[in-house]
């Protein structure tokens, strides 16, 4: 025999996955697959490094699934794919955790503790959750190498980062400057623009209208508007637009004069004002005003500060048209003030705010106060001084620190920069050379970000990171950028074993120009610089692996979330362009975000999403994988995560797939039992059966489609057809060929049907392996026996190629036509409450296309059988059957476009349009009504049956096809329907008893009332029911002395009640019986394949047998006591339990 193992009645997908995962681990399956492929062409993949300071979430699982699918696909498509995990280990995420734990409030606390001690604390936690990551990724089915990972803290990785920076320095792309930057006061460090763009929030801030008194006219005030009162102590200038019109207004009560932009006068909310003068902004230039605060009054003499400037950045859509300038707290302020000589780039900064966001001694009145807390104090003082014109609040979007979730300040910081702005043309050109899915993210979001790129501040005033490799003389004139450990050892004369701050801060380099010694600058690199360096740093390039890197750069593929357009994607491209003038990758999949079911961001504190591992343990990783990548999220859109979506995939995809596989194995075993011969699927004699030819053609066409789309990385296009395949397989092929597969049409036909089904199952298992690796492995380990394969894993196989000789577009078209007709007739049956078990006299199919009707007739026997109809008629003439066309206007779309004309157009469509106009519209897709050209989006066409069709015909249609069914009844049709109902009850009882086709049993049946039509039909048609079910049936209840039945049921059919008792032959049942009303379920505690592990497993089998997937269930003993969840299920053998819902 073929040696196929018996497939159990039910499956716990998660448990079977655990077994497969254990097998992979025990047999080193992933490592062996890599070893087997080492001589193949390389497919290079870069893995964006996560931080191990947090647990993996759905976003990580999504990107990991995408990476795994593409990696497996490339591997099984003939490539060697190094899948190496990497870790981000430096930077704010780590330091922020340590600061919270140790109560560190600023750099001074770190210096007291000592950098070595501080960094040692950081080193302890960087891999806190690495074990959980490895376990989760393994359980998700992601094949990735953790053993040979890379970490940004490895000295060899850091050395490559130094090399990269030294190359940029040689190219003249590194400079030191003062720049107003987003600053995290919680983390005491500046952030780059792309970091600041990651976490905007809507906040309410004070909005104050402040009067600045003119020196020459103290009664006249220029009114500026600001949402940052805390910056007012640092004010040095005001700006107005030179070409806009300003008004001088006078308060009729106080006599105070206010100057504002004419368009913004209403913002003062003062009805007591009169306009006394109008001035162009240029006329206000160089007017001098009194400083609000005395702290920097000396700047009037030093730099001619506290005067009015002109600039065109001033707008009329907000504020007052007068903009207050605190140049060290605003990027535009800084540029304007430098351009007008109010400040100089190289002067001492007027920035009286420290790294914690608190005022320094330069503002003694508020020294030590956090600036946001000082807003109220400053507003109070302005009021007391008579400078507060109006106080309000404004809701606006404001950036927060991506790590600490605290508001950022914009303040001037001396930093080391990479001159990105000079690279913009090359960045855009290199971006054009890459291929993105979806394309719009590359062409719009990312390209726009590149066009507006700013110089990158790569230095951070922190401790745990790769130190910036610059050694500078005390006067700043001599700078050495060290590019390697060896170079530092040579220049310093010291042995270097590590590159962290505690190891290199005290290393000095003698000056070559007599300037004493050079000391390292104190800053470390932005951790994004490190992750952006990973393509070469993970290989310790250029110190090692030079050929490996250069031969395989750029990467073939990367994938991360859409938020990385301003993160990793950006830094990869900047550094690759600057260093190699190449894009860093060829192909990219950019996924959207995974949100909670209500559309909110997933939050641990809100508990608004289910734990990922609970989902995996409940439904299996394959179901979660398929759910995530069969959604808009792989097209760059957002996904609202719903547990029901994962559950539905299990029900709609995996269970039909399992049942098809089980059906195949059962019938191969039955075939071998019947013939005594081994089933040989390799003996391929072309089948003449149209359904065999169709399913093989359909599957090979699917293979061709999937391969083509995967070549273009369009996962979103392939997963839908793959998941729908199983509905096609089970509800078309198996449903219409069940009797052939079971051998009812003879052994020759059975072999053809089994061979076709087997070939299709193996083909789809190989095709789906990268997407659902666990279940494909589970099936392969059994199915490989029928083809005599010795391959130990489906993942060692190459992906299938379509067999073009089996693709028959004609037969695929015909079956698609058949499906269309079947679906339309089913809709009529459902609408009219006509179960398929009850036969109908006639169905009529109307379509103008003769080819369509020919296709219908070619599969007439299947259509009639499936729909349980006696006669099929086709026609091109709808008038013959009283069918007319009817226009259905889309009022929403028409109303939006036609406005007042909509009513006339709709009236014409409803009451005046002719049949010929609608016929023409169906052909051409456009229609002119009252001078308006309408599209098929705006008008739909449906079919209507005339009033003369009331003689029993019911209709339904789509855009091109009409079906009509004769619903009139006669006795023979009713009797046949009743007979089918009973047959169905017996078959369901066999299933409930978990019998396979080779198991023998007999049934007793009682129909009440005894004189009902159903009782007479059962008596008359008993032999037909026995033949259809393969089960002997006896009229009457079982004798009193009979043993307990294997299964029982009681149900209603029409106006009768049917009670059935099934007795399995040779039954020595060692299981548990569960009763649910009139139904019984028997669960084996131990079978050849598995044994029941506990109470939860018992409930799973009960749910599966009774199709009870919703709601809670429990079990109770015959005495009414509850069965405890911790019970040893073996103690329940032989007992009958009651189901409780």
From Swiss-Prot:
Give the keywords, sorted. Aminoacyl-tRNA synthetase, ATP-binding, Cytoplasm, Ligase, Nucleotide-binding, Protein biosynthesis
Which cellular component terms (GO) are annotated to the entry? cytoplasm
Annotated catalysed reactions: tRNA(Ile) + L-isoleucine + ATP = L-isoleucyl-tRNA(Ile) + AMP + diphosphate
InterPro entries for the chain: aa-tRNA-synth_I_CS, aa-tRNA-synth_Ia, Anticodon_Ile_ABEc, Ile-tRNA-ligase, Ile-tRNA-ligase_type2, M/V/L/I-tRNA-synth_anticd-bd, Rossmann-like_a/b/a_fold, tRNAsynth_Ia_anticodon-bd
Segments spanning the bilayer are none
Residues the record lists as binding ATP:
604
The record places the motif ('KMSKS' region) at 601-605
Q: Which Gene3D superfamilies match?
A: HUPs, Isoleucyl-tRNA Synthetase, Domain 1
- Protein name as it appears in the record: Isoleucine--tRNA ligase, cytoplasmic
Organism annotation: Caenorhabditis elegans
């Amino acid at each position: 025999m073929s040696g196929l193992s018996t497939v159990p009645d039910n499956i716990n997908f998660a448990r079977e996955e655990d077994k497969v995962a254990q097998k992979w681990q025990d047999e080193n399956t992933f490592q062996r697959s890599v070893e087997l492929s080492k001589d193949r062409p390389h497919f290079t993949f870069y893995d964006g490094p996560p931080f191990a300071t947090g647990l993996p979430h759905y976003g990580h699982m999504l990107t990991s699934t995408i990476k795994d699918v593409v990696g497996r696909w490339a591997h099984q498509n003939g490539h060697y794919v190094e899948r190496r995990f990497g870790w981000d280990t430096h930077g704010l995420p780590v330091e922020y955790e340590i600061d919270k734990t140790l109560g560190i409030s600023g750099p001074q606390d770190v210096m007291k503790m000592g950098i070595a001690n501080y960094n040692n604390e950081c080193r302890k936690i960087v891999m806190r959750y690495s074990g959980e990551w490895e376990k989760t990724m393994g359980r998700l089915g992601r094949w990735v190498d953790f053993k040979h990972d890379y970490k940004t803290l490895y000295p060899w990785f850091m050395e490559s980062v130094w090399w990269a920076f030294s190359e940029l320095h040689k190219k003249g792309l590194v400079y030191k400057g003062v720049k107003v930057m987003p600053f995290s006061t919680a983390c005491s460090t500046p952030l780059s623009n792309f970091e600041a763009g990651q976490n905007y929030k809507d906040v309410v801030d004070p909005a104050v209208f402040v009067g600045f008194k003119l020196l020459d006219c103290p009664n006249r005030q220029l009114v500026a508007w600001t949402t940052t009162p805390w910056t007012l102590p640092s004010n040095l200038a005001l700006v107005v637009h030179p070409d806009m019109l300003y008004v001088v207004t006078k308060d009729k009560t106080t006599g105070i004069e206010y100057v504002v932009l004419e368009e913004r006068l209403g913002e003062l909310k003062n009805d007591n004002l009169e306009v006394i003068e109008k001035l162009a902004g240029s006329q206000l230039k160089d007017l001098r005003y009194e400083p609000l605060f005395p702290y920097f009054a000396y700047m009037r003499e030093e730099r001619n500060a506290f005067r009015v400037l002109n600039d065109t950045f001033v707008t009329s859509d907000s504020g007052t048209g007068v903009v207050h300038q605190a140049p060290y707290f605003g990027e535009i302020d800084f540029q304007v003030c430098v351009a007008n000589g109010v400040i100089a780039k190289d002067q001492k900064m007027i920035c009286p705010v420290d790294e914690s966001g608190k005022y320094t001694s330069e503002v003694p009145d508020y020294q030590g106060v956090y600036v946001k807390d000082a807003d109220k104090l400053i507003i109070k003082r302005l009021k007391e001084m008579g400078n507060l014109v109006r106080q309000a609040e404004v809701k606006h979007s404001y950036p927060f620190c991506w790590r600490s979730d605290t508001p950022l300040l914009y303040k001037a910081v001396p930093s080391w920069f990479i001159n990105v702005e000079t690279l913009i043309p090359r960045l855009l050109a290199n971006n054009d050379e890459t291929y993105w899915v979806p394309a719009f993210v590359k062409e719009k979001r990312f390209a726009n970000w590149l066009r507006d790129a700013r110089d990158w501040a790569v230095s951070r005033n922190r401790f745990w990171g790769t130190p910036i490799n610059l050694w500078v003389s005390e006067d700043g004139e001599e700078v050495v950028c060290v590019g390697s450990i060896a170079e530092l050892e040579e220049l310093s004369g010291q042995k270097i074993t590590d590159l962290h701050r505690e190891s290199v801060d005290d290393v000095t380099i003698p000056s070559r120009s007599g300037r004493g010694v050079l000391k390292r600058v104190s800053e470390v690199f932005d951790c994004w610089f490190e992750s952006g360096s990973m393509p070469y740093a993970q290989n310790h390039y250029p110190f090692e692996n030079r050929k490996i890197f250069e031969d395989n750069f750029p990467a073939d593929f990367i994938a991360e979330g859409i938020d990385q357009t301003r993160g990793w994607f950006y830094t990869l491209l900047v550094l690759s362009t600057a260093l190699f003038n190449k894009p860093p990758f060829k192909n990219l999949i950019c996924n959207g975000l995974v949100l909670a079911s209500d559309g909110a961001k997933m939050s641990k504190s809100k508990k608004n999403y289910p734990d990922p591992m609970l989902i995996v343990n409940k439904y299996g990783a394959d179901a979660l994988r398929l759910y995530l990548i069969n959604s808009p999220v792989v097209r760059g859109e957002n996904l609202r995560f719903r547990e029901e979506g994962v559950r539905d995939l299990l029900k709609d995809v995996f269970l039909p797939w399992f049942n098809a596989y089980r059906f195949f194995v059962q019938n191969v075993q039955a075939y071998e039992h019947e013939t005594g011969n081994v089933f040989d699927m390799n003996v391929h004699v072309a089948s003449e059966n149209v359904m065999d030819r169709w399913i093989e053609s359909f599957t090979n066409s699917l293979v061709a489609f999937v391969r083509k789309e995967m070549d273009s990385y369009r996962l979103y296009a392939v997963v839908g057809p793959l998941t729908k395949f199983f509905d096609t397989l089970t509800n078309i092929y198996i449903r219409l060929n069940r009797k052939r597969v079971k051998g009812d049409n003879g052994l020759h036909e059975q072999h053809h049907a089994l061979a076709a089904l087997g070939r299709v199952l193996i083909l789809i298992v190989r095709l789906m392996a990268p997407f659902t690796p666990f279940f494909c492995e589970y099936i392969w380990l059994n199915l490989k026996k029928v083809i005599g394969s010795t391959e130990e894993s489906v993942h060692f196989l190459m992906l299938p190629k379509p067999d073009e000789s089996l693709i028959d577009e004609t037969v695929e078209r015909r079956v698609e036509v058949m499906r269309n007709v079947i679906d339309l007739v089913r809709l009529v049956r459902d609408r009219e409450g006509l179960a398929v078990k009850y036969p109908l006299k006639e169905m009529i199919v109307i379509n103008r296309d003769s080819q369509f009707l020919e296709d219908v007739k070619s599969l007439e026997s299947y259509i009639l059988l499936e729909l349980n109809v006696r006669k099929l008629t086709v026609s091109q003439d709808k008038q013959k059957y009283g069918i007319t066309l009817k226009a259905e206007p889309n009022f929403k779309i028409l109303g939006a476009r036609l406005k007042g004309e909509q009513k006339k157009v709709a009236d014409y469509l409803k009451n005046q349009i002719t049949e010929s106009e609608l016929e023409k519209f169906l052909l051409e897709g456009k229609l002119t009504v009252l001078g308006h050209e309408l599209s098929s989006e705006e008008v739909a066409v449906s079919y209507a049956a005339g009033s003369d069709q009331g003689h029993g015909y019911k209709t339904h249609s789509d855009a091109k096809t009409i079906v009509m069914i004769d619903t009139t009844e006669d006795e023979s049709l009713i009797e046949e329907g009743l007979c089918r109902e009973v047959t169905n009850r017996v078959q369901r009882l066999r299933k409930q008893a978990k019998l396979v086709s080779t198991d023998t049993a007999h049934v007793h049946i009682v129909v009440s009332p005894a004189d009902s039509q159903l009782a007479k039909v059962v008596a008359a048609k008993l032999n037909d029911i026995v033949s259809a079910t393969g089960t002997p049936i006896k009229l009457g209840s079982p004798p009193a002395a009979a043993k307990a039945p294997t299964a029982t049921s009681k149900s209603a059919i029409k106006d009768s009640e049917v009670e059935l008792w099934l007795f399995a032959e040779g039954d020595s049942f060692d299981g548990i019986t569960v009763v649910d009303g009139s139904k019984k379920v028997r669960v084996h505690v131990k079978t050849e394949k598995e044994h029941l592990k506990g109470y939860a497993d018992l409930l799973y089998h009960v749910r599966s047998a009774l199709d009870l997937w919703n709601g809670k269930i429990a079990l109770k003993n015959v005495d009414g006591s509850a069965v405890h969840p911790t019970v040893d299920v073996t103690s329940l053998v032989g007992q009958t339990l009651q189901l409780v819902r």
